[in-house]
């Protein structure tokens, strides 16, 4: 008996010795080419770069992996306990590998296999860290052995808290979220500190199968997994029975980021992305660096600008009438047939519908959700002139675009025309809003910064400014009659015409500008000379190399909305150089400022993620560089206010504000423009086809683009005071006759003359600048200041 027992012990000892030897050999063999796990001590995870508006609203997030790093000390214990209960019960006691857990899982999986249940894993949190950071997902014995060896080694080097920090920040949780902080934001719009027990358990349940555990698609499975984690938390002593019951009883309610916390500005965000990548000279740093970027964007103005542009494009498009239905489908199974159709691009808030029946007075429609509604004929009148019956416009089975309005629907169509709008602070250059097109998802081409177009009459402003700079007086008479320009050897003569083909005879330079008379502009240009006009076009940044031909004075040069709006911003600020900019401040992931546009000391500029409502200073920098003298600049500003008061921008008078502005229409009405400004804001807008073609025989900046400006200003500035433009000391205001330009006691227009060239004028009719404000809008006494 003793011999048998002794023999058994010997065999057992030999087996142990062999096992130890084999284990030692395996460890020795696989320890030579292990990855360098010391890199874990230098963990520097790629993080999300966020772009914010000036008032702290999130514009966009960029990342290769959407991750928000959170130090382990900031992770609440309830969230940590959820993961321990779900993934690794013995995490705090085992040396990186859980031998008891492996044995337990082996026996449990035999039972699970026999009963067709899900197999249990035995990987510890430490092993998952090793797999995520240092090894591949290859299924092999060699990889598993290396995983075990490294797990044991790093458990001897790193603390449990360090290992947890790596795990909680690196793990993928679905919906593009890496790390618990990103998961909390993605699923619940909360920080990790705000999560409830039930929400913590939900997040802890995700790593097993993040792509499959989607509450929207498989709610019962997701809830069962979450409830399992909650039960484990109770069994492990982390929560009480009452807490467990309450948590299990709570539904899974996912929350998106609140609308008031964000602002849609796709074109703006793309401009910022490109600009910051250029500044950093690194796409990698932009997408991985966890930057916080504060922009100049004003969330309210951005939304209003987008709304006004879309409204204007839609209204102009409807003037051409209804083109045709998208398709025609059989009505036997209309809902399914409607679902099969590809969703039209740029549908936005519009809906797809099918005509189920038509009568003289309305169309009955079906929507993709199966609901039915009506379109009254009054909501189709735009589609065809003198529409008497819906039957002449639509038929059964027609697929159309509709817009929900009060108590019914309206017939709509997606505009083919496109456009852009840009809003600037003329003193600082801050781009407060920028919308580069009708819909970014359809076309990422930015018509603010990328579209080169002919500005038409917008360029006239700078022809007249060149004349004023060179001493031409605003009341000088020019003839609005036929003219032939001899352009030189080998060049054909040029015979420009007015827009409507008429001639109005003699008029002052001011009147010629206000009425946007082409022939007056050409005569002013001949008086000044093309060299000076080319110089001013370059000086104002409209075009760096304009072709020196006379047609340029009527807008044949090419420019972008950004460039021409900035040129008008220079006029609006009194003639000082300014450049449009989108980015105010950039911080790295640690809050260190790596770029600030305004380098003056600012005690409120260290903005952390939790403190983004801090405002950026708006105090304008004084710039010693003057683009034009203040007297000439004021004179052209006076002309531009006149263009609103009695010229082509007359419709803007309904705003009841002091506004300066100019319309623009290129040859054949292919491009239409309007740029308007007050002492505080400049708004530039443009409408045209991406492939240039005529907008219509009667399409002009006045009737196509000016309504967009008016709609924007009516909403953005309706409560703002009407501020006049400051009259410089170098200007004297004199009453003159609008028609003859001569000084008369009760002149019909108050003209701005330079002090140094009015000696020959009769002093009897000079008006003290301080006395003029009782009856002349748009003028500001020198004693007043504009901020």
Curated annotation (Swiss-Prot):
Pathway: Cell wall biogenesis; peptidoglycan biosynthesis. It is found in: Cell inner membrane. It catalyses: [GlcNAc-(1->4)-Mur2Ac(oyl-L-Ala-gamma-D-Glu-L-Lys-D-Ala-D-Ala)](n)-di-trans,octa-cis-undecaprenyl diphosphate + beta-D-GlcNAc-(1->4)-Mur2Ac(oyl-L-Ala-gamma-D-Glu-L-Lys-D-Ala-D-Ala)-di-trans,octa-cis-undecaprenyl diphosphate = [GlcNAc-(1->4)-Mur2Ac(oyl-L-Ala-gamma-D-Glu-L-Lys-D-Ala-D-Ala)](n+1)-di-trans,octa-cis-undecaprenyl diphosphate + di-trans,octa-cis-undecaprenyl diphosphate + H(+); Preferential cleavage: (Ac)2-L-Lys-D-Ala-|-D-Ala. Also transpeptidation of peptidyl-alanyl moieties that are N-acyl substituents of D-alanine. The chain crosses the membrane at residues 7-27. Its main location: membrane. InterPro entries: Beta-lactam/transpept-like, Glyco_trans_51, Glycosyltr_51/Transpeptidase, Lysozyme-like_dom_sf, PBP_transglycosylase, PCB_OB, PCN-bd_Tpept. SUPFAM superfamilies: beta-lactamase/transpeptidase-like, Lysozyme-like. GO terms for molecular function: penicillin binding; peptidoglycan glycosyltransferase activity; serine-type D-Ala-D-Ala carboxypeptidase activity. Residues 398-711 are annotated as: Transpeptidase. It comes from the Bacteria. Disulfide bonds: none annotated. GO terms for cellular component: outer membrane-bounded periplasmic space; plasma membrane. PANTHER family: BINDING PROTEIN TRANSPEPTIDASE, PUTATIVE-RELATED, PENICILLIN-BINDING PROTEIN 1A. This is Penicillin-binding protein 1A. It is a single-pass type II membrane protein. The keyword Glycosyltransferase applies. Cell wall formation. Synthesis of cross-linked peptidoglycan from the lipid intermediates. The enzyme has a penicillin-insensitive transglycosylase N-terminal domain (formation of linear glycan strands) and a penicillin-sensitive transpeptidase C-terminal domain (cross-linking of the peptide subunits). It comes from Rickettsia prowazekii (strain Madrid E). Residues 28-787 are periplasmic. Residues 1-6 are cytoplasmic. The active site is at residues 87, 457. One of its GO terms (biological process) is regulation of cell shape.
